[in-house]
C-alpha cells in the first residue's frame, strides 16, 4: 500500500493543517532567549531553574531511546501524555463527526469509546467471544463489521484489558490486508511486555495502515509520568503531531523516562516482568482452587480476570483485607467479575488469604 493511501484516510480538512507553531519549533540560535514570554528567573521550588522554559515538544533523546526500545525509526514515533492522548489524536485526526466509524471489541479499555463519542464518531461494537480459551477477538467478524460501517479506525487491544487475551500476529495481518486503504488498525500493546505474542510493530514495514500504542506506565512503572508512544507511518505521525498540543511532554517526565530506558534500568524492568509472569501463573493456579471462584481467564497481561459465584462478597472481603481490585460488574457480560492486578508475592498472598477466609466464614 502506498504512503498516500494512509494519508487519504485523514480528514480532508486536516491534510494541509499547519498546527500551532510554538517558540520551541523554530530553528533560531542564541544564548539569550526572549521569544516565549518565559520567566528570566527560576521558581524557589526549582533550584536549578530547569523548568522555567517550555519543554521540547518531542524530546530528541527520549524519542531516540523509545524508537530503539520499540524497533522503529524516530520519525515513526510520537510521544504523548499516555496512550490516551494518542487514541484521541487518531480519532480526531481521521474521523469526520457523524460519518466515520470506530470499531471496538468490548469488554475492553474504555477510552476508545470515550474518544469516539467525544468526536461524535459512530461506534461499532464487536464483542469478544467467550470460548474455551478465554475471551478472544473474532478478527474476521471485526473486519466485516469495519467494512460494513465504513470505519476509519479499528482498535485491537492485545493483550486485551480486561480480558487478558492476545491476538496472534497472523490474525492482525489478516485485518491489515483486508482494510488496506479503508481503515487504520490500531493495536494497543500497553501490556505487550508481559505477552508471549511478538509486537505488531514489525508489520509496519509492510502495512502503513497500522498504528501501535505503547506505554511506560505498566512494565516500566512510570504511570504518573504519562509517557505514551504512538508508532505509525511517518507521514501520519507528522500530521498528528501538528494536531497535538504544543508542549505535551513535561521536562521532568522526559528526564525520568529517558533514565528509565538506560541499560541498567531496563535490566531491572525485565527482571520484574519475569517475576510478574511467574506470579501471574502462581496466582492463577491458586485461584482456580479457591471455593467460590467460577473461572480464571488465561492472561497475557499483568492482571487476571476472575468470575465469582458472588462477586460482591469477594469484592467486600478483599476491601476488608485492605486490598482494592477493579470491579468489573458494571461492564456488560462481566457482572460476576473482578480484575486483579498481579502484585508482589506478599500482596498476592493477601488476595488469596482474604478469599479463602471468606469461604471459610460462609
UniProtKB/Swiss-Prot annotation:
Its cofactor is pyridoxal 5'-phosphate. CDD domains: AAT_like. Pfam families: Aminotran_1_2 (PF00155). InterPro entries: Aminotransferase_I/II_large, HisP_aminotrans, PyrdxlP-dep_Trfase, PyrdxlP-dep_Trfase_major, PyrdxlP-dep_Trfase_small. The modification N6-(pyridoxal phosphate)lysine is found at residue 218. Keywords: Amino-acid biosynthesis, Aminotransferase, Histidine biosynthesis, Pyridoxal phosphate, Transferase. One of its GO terms (molecular function) is pyridoxal phosphate binding. Pathway: Amino-acid biosynthesis; L-histidine biosynthesis; L-histidine from 5-phospho-alpha-D-ribose 1-diphosphate: step 7/9. Its EC number is 2.6.1.9. SUPFAM superfamilies: PLP-dependent transferases (SSF53383). One of its GO terms (biological process) is L-histidine biosynthetic process. It catalyses: L-histidinol phosphate + 2-oxoglutarate = 3-(imidazol-4-yl)-2-oxopropyl phosphate + L-glutamate. Gene3D superfamilies: Aspartate Aminotransferase, domain 1, Type I PLP-dependent aspartate aminotransferase-like (Major domain). Belongs to the class-II pyridoxal-phosphate-dependent aminotransferase family. Histidinol-phosphate aminotransferase subfamily. Homodimer. This is Histidinol-phosphate aminotransferase. The gene is hisC.
